[in-house]
From Swiss-Prot:
Signal peptide: none annotated. It is an enzyme of class 2 (transferase). Pfam families: Carboxyl_trans (PF01039). GO terms for cellular component: methylcrotonoyl-CoA carboxylase complex. Belongs to the AccD/PCCB family. Residues 16-272 form the CoA carboxyltransferase N-terminal domain. This is Biotin-dependent 3-methylcrotonyl-coenzyme A carboxylase beta1 subunit. The keyword Amino-acid biosynthesis does not apply.
Length: 529
């Protein structure tokens, strides 16, 4: 086992603390949900606020790993904080469950495009990790002004119900509590659940609400008469339990969860957790906030892993990629961490290590800070494309759980080789200083300026340095905006932005969630030699 000597670099802590304070402010604002008027109206109807519902549902004192709390940020003005839905994983009656809770204080809980994406992402987490789903329903259905973005396509609203059906078929429990409106297609959430609860004189379920019924048939009927709790619990049979209020409904859901039975045994050996020898808050000191500034990634590893100890694989070979066996909160992990640009040797080492972890049922933790693969004539002649492809293939085919944390830059093909979103990591998080794009803004501006300059030169048109700079400036600005972690997390390119000092805790929680899902057989395609 290896513990490197620790030498803290000049402090970068002030900038990290500023970034974390900005993150916490954004999280607090999103957690409020709708505006004060909407929240007061919600409470005046005898309802608990959405986060109160989640808190009451969870086992007291247990953690809640929230997914994408800043989804939709800035995408629809201020209309949809958190995409109007709360998703995450928490313990209910002793069993880890995925929780999906509509926030009716945000546009009546209606589904914007990012609301659908966030709901589907939560179901994907449930399916990958074999976790029961609990839906706290209070939604007006699809947001009609954007119906073309939420209704017809494969990954739109209907996929929610497809997922419910297929997960139930796999033995993954589906439970719904109707705590408010459940309208139109949304009515299938309780109807397709294994068990459903509804609150008396508060919850309603109908495919067509009173206005639609009147328009279609001329019948005038109240929401309670059309689809209230008494109707569905006594007459239609759509729901199985009638609750008096939110508190009673959540009590019933907890009782249902108590019948789920135990989860599968862990797929790997879990030992006693040992705290690192070095405080996690020191990550603020050892990691430059600017991803372009080099540092030794070993300094990150020793502040995340148990006992600050790890066994490095091929330490003297391909040194721009650190590969190591370690433990986090008692769980084994194979760490793949960038320590510079990727060369052929780094990629071959990474592919070898990933295969080893896959064979040994060791989950993989990718720490991304990657500018990409080395470029140039000699490197192309040396086969860097085929060697990089080996690592990308290994990442794609590995059947063990993969977790990714973007701790700096995530650029170009380096994103692929380090298990970016397209490679289905079980979870992916970003630090507040992270950046993500096809290449850096300066590189993009230079490439496009070169192309433009050649076009002008061929036409015999002069191009002054000032004109070239004026051409480059908006490109840099675009990449700075779109490479920002808040731009990423708004679009669910990740599962959330986390405080660097919380990395060990978040990774440990995720490993505990991944541990009980059966693993597929190892299988790889052709590695081009």
């Amino acid at each position: 086992m290896t513990t490197p000597s620790i030498a803290i670099a000049p402090s970068f802590a002030d900038e990290h603390r500023r970034l974390v304070a900005e993150l916490n402010n954004k999280l607090a604002a999103a957690a409020l949900g709708g505006n004060e008027r909407a929240r007061k109206r919600h409470v005046s109807r005898g309802k608990l606020l959405p986060r109160e519902r989640v808190d009451r549902l969870l086992d007291p004192g247990s953690p809640f790993l929230e997914l994408a709390p800043l989804a939709a940020g800035g995408m629809y003005g201020d209309e949809s904080p958190g995409a109007g839905i709360i998703t995450g994983i928490g313990r209910v009656s002793g069993r880890q469950c995925v929780i999906v809770a509509n926030d009716a204080t945000v546009k009546g809980g209606t589904y914007y495009p990012m609301t659908v994406k966030k709901h589907l992402r939560a179901q994907e987490v449930a399916l990958q990790n074999m976790l029961p789903c609990i839906y706290l329903v209070d939604s007006g259905g699809a947001f009609l002004p954007r119906q073309d973005e939420v209704f017809p396509d494969r990954e739109h609203f209907g996929r929610i119900f497809y997922n419910q059906a297929t997960m139930s078929a796999k033995g993954i429990p589906q439970v719904a509590a109707v705590l408010g409106s459940c309208t139109a297609g949304g009515a299938y959430v309780p109807a397709m659940s294994d068990e459903a609860v509804i609150v008396r004189e508060q919850g309603t379920i109908f495919l067509g609400g009173p206005p639609l019924v009147k328009a279609a048939t001329g019948e005038i009927v109240s929401a309670e008469e059309l689809g209230g709790g008494d109707l569905h619990s006594r007459t239609s049979g759509v729901t199985d339990h009638l609750a008096d209020d939110d508190e009673d409904a959540l009590r019933i859901v907890r009782a249902i969860a108590d019948t789920f039975g135990p989860c599968e045994p862990a797929q790997w050996d879990v030992r006693r957790s040992v705290e690192p020898k070095y405080p996690q808050a020191e990550l603020y000191d050892v990691v430059p906030p600017d991803p372009r500034v080099p540092y030794d990634v070993h300094e990150v590893v020793v502040r995340i892993v148990d006992g600050s100890e790890f066994s490095e694989f091929k330490a003297k070979y391909g040194k721009t990629l650190v590969t190591a066996f370690a433990r986090v909160h008692g769980h084994p992990v194979g760490i793949v961490a960038n320590n510079g640009v990727l060369f052929s040797e780094s990629a071959l080492k990474g592919a070898h290590f990933i295969e080893l972890c896959d064979k040994r049922k060791i989950p993989l933790l990718f720490l991304q800070n990657i500018a990409g693969f080395m470029v140039g004539r000699d490197y192309e002649a040396g086969g860097i494309a085929k060697h990089g492809a080996k690592m990308v293939t290994a990442v794609a085919c590995a059947r063990v759980p993969k977790l990714t944390v973007v701790i700096g830059g995530s650029y170009g093909a380096g994103n692929y080789s380090m298990c970016g979103r397209a490679y289905s990591p079980r979870f992916l998080w970003m630090w507040p200083n992270a950046r993500i794009s096809v290449m850096g803004g300066e590189q993009a501006a230079s490439v496009l300026a070169t192309v433009r300059g050649e076009q002008l030169s061929a036409a015999g048109t002069p191009w002054s340095p000032d004109e070239e700079e004026a051409f480059k400036a908006p490109i840099r600005a675009q990449y700075e905006d779109q490479g920002n972690p808040y731009y990423s997390t708004a679009r669910l390119w990740d599962d959330g932005i986390i405080d660097p000092a919380d990395t060990r805790t978040v990774v440990g929680l995720a490993l505990s969630l991944c541990a009980h899902a059966p693993l597929d057989q190892v299988g790889y395609g052709v590695f081009r030699m």
